[in-house]
Amino acid sequence: MLRIVKKLGIILFVSSISINSFAKSMYDDVDSAPDYDSTPYYENEGSLVFKMRLGGVFSSAKQKGLPTPTSPQPVPVGEVAKNGYGGDASTTIFFNNYLATELSLGFNVLRTKYTSLAAVAHNYGVNNVKLGKNKPIYMIPATVTGQFHIAPYGGIRPYVGVGYHGSYMLTQATGLKIRNGHGLVGQIGVDFYAKDDTLINIDVRQFFLNPKLEYKPNLVGTKTVTSKVKLNPLIVSIGIGFTF
């Protein structure tokens, strides 16, 4: 009988230790579990987002439609402009969590290439022309874009868009005039929300733009030479935004 009591006592003692250890481990697990109530939750409080961006402009600037050269020994014309830089300001209007429209106004700079202008002057009758100081091509696009926000909740929110732009074109390069243009725009980007009302934006937009070029008589002789240039600039930007 005494042996049985001793065995029962040992079993109860070991059981109590085991239960106490299990309860302590459960308490520690609960205590170390994440507090979901305190996890940051990003949600738009307003239907407007204002953004300011700076970025690089990448363009091949290939010409097409040039007339037959008058020079007996023509040379390749090549690209009329180099890559450049620019920036824009935009306002995004949300209709719901997924659909929005972005209105933007930009200012971009493309550097003209001396070699291209000199080649045009050589091919169409004016050699040894003084090109003067290198003057850039300015592109000022006003753009309307419809956007679809793929994941509108959380701190990382990607989006895609398609729209249309009208671009005011300007240059003071010697003997060169560029006409205004317009075309489609494709867009992809992502917003990183730092706080409920502040975000970092990375944006990529492909502009389709083929404006008309006019080479003036002081560069090409007695008559104006016209062509089209396939600018189609790709603009990669980073910026900051605020929700309202």
Curated annotation (Swiss-Prot):
Keywords: Cell outer membrane, Membrane, Signal, Transmembrane, Transmembrane beta strand
UniProt cross-references to Gene3D superfamilies, sorted A to Z: 2.40.160.20
Major location category of this protein: membrane
Subcellular location: Cell outer membrane
Cellular component terms per the entry's GO annotation: cell outer membrane
Annotated signal peptide: 1-23
GO biological process, one term: transmembrane transport
Keyword rRNA-binding: no
Keyword Cell division recorded: no
Domain of life: Bacteria
Disulfide bond positions: none
Protein family (similarity comment): Belongs to the OmpW/AlkL family.
Name this polypeptide is given: Putative outer membrane protein RF_0060
Source organism: Rickettsia felis (strain ATCC VR-1525 / URRWXCal2) (Rickettsia azadi)
Upper classification of the organism: Bacteria, Pseudomonadati, Pseudomonadota, Alphaproteobacteria, Rickettsiales
